[in-house]
Amino acid sequence: MAAQPNAPESAWPVRELNSKVKSWIERLGHLWVEGQITQLNMKPSWKFSYITLRDPEAEASVQLTCATSLLHSLPSRLQDGDRVVVYGKPAFYEGRGSFSLWVTDIRPVGVGELLARIERLRQQLASEGLFDPALKKPLPFLPHTIGLITGRGSAAERDVLAVAHSRWPEVKFNVINTAVQGARAVPEIIEALQRLDADPSVDVIIIARGGGSVEDLLPFSEEALQRAVVAAHTPVVSAIGHEPDNPVLDNVADLRAATPTDAAKKVVPDVAAERQLIAELRSRSAAALRGWVHKERQQLAAVRSRPALADPVRAITLHREEIARSISSIRRDMRYMLSTERATVASLRQQVAALGPSATLARGYAVVQVVPRDGSAPEVVTTIGMSPPGSQLRIRVADGSITAAAMQTTPAD
């Protein structure tokens, strides 16, 4: 038979809705479910006990119902924050429209299994690069305000505050107390982290707890907390104080401290040590300056002791005398060169004069030229044919010239 369609005219009564929901839920059958106990309501006189089981990785929970005798039969008493695996059947109560898981078996999650899960999470986050040193944010040298997330009235809080103020009395703290174990720890720590990260006056955040068992420290290995730390803009210091099974928070934090006291020492500089360092640096600087001045004085004295600076005019005098000697030598050489060249010129003149026509004429020779009748330039007579009888001649002698006429030509024998 087909289901009756649901409409305003044919609305289901509540009993029918609850009946249908109950039938749907009961189809799931028996299930194994894992979670963290956040609330346990049990009294020895009660036949049934009621437990709230929370998913540590998400904001989700479910109500458990079990026989009180089942809780008494467990090897150890259950407490808030315990990780357990339960076996039960989903149940829906029609009368009040509520859901619960009817549990018939409860098994605590062993330490070995918890450590194995932590290691798997560590490997997963490492493969995502969340442990990369390049992601680590540097801590300020001198933080003005430190955010501190820790348990209320805990030894971790007292240690961090005492050590920090002993090292630098002016440092300020913004302390947020949260649960540091159990089901409420992770959401409270994440909320505190986000509040401090949003505060611009906070320079660094310390998450501190003074050690504990593996089960107690499980919140500091929850994936949600690790991703919140990575997403923070403010440097985060992990100070959980547990060896050797350190929580995953140590890997994702920007700095890991072995204990809360160690965190205070790493975050806050020691004012006495800084003053001592300043005094040492001042002393070294003064010594270096004195050494430099002494060295410069020695170099200045060495420069002053040089002869050129002892008698600066002496160098000028020496150069002046050298220049005078050079000028005298040059003049002497020039006079010698001029005298030599004059003698050479005179000798050449004598040679030229001896070979020239004037010298030849002076020895009684003459140059005979025929003067053409057309008025052209006279020509030297070298043959008798050039001066036929009747030609006008000009005879050049040593002291002048003679005009004559050719009377007769006689050829040589």
Swiss-Prot record:
Q: What Gene Ontology biological process does one annotation of this record name?
A: DNA catabolic process
Question: What EC identifiers does the entry list?
Answer: 3.1.11.6
Q: Which CDD domains match?
A: ExoVII_LU_OBF
Sorted alphabetically, which keywords does the UniProt record give?
A: Cytoplasm, Exonuclease, Hydrolase, Nuclease
Q: What class of enzyme is it?
A: hydrolase
Gene Ontology MF terms in the entry: exodeoxyribonuclease VII activity; nucleic acid binding
Where is the protein situated, by its record's location annotation?
Answer: Cytoplasm
Q: Give the matching Pfam families.
A: Exonuc_VII_L, tRNA_anti_2
| Coiled-coil spans in chain | none
The reaction(s) this protein catalyses = Exonucleolytic cleavage in either 5'- to 3'- or 3'- to 5'-direction to yield nucleoside 5'-phosphates
Where does it mainly reside? cytoplasm
Q: Name one GO cellular component term.
A: exodeoxyribonuclease VII complex
State the InterPro entries in the record. Answer: Exonuc_VII_L, Exonuc_VII_lsu_C, OB-fold_nuc-bd_dom
UniProt family annotation: Belongs to the XseA family.
Q: How does it assemble?
A: Heterooligomer composed of large and small subunits.
What biological function has been recorded for the protein in this entry?
Answer: Bidirectionally degrades single-stranded DNA into large acid-insoluble oligonucleotides, which are then degraded further into small acid-soluble oligonucleotides.
Listed name of the protein: Exodeoxyribonuclease 7 large subunit
- Which species is this UniProt entry from? Corynebacterium diphtheriae (strain ATCC 700971 / NCTC 13129 / Biotype gravis)
What gene makes this protein? xseA
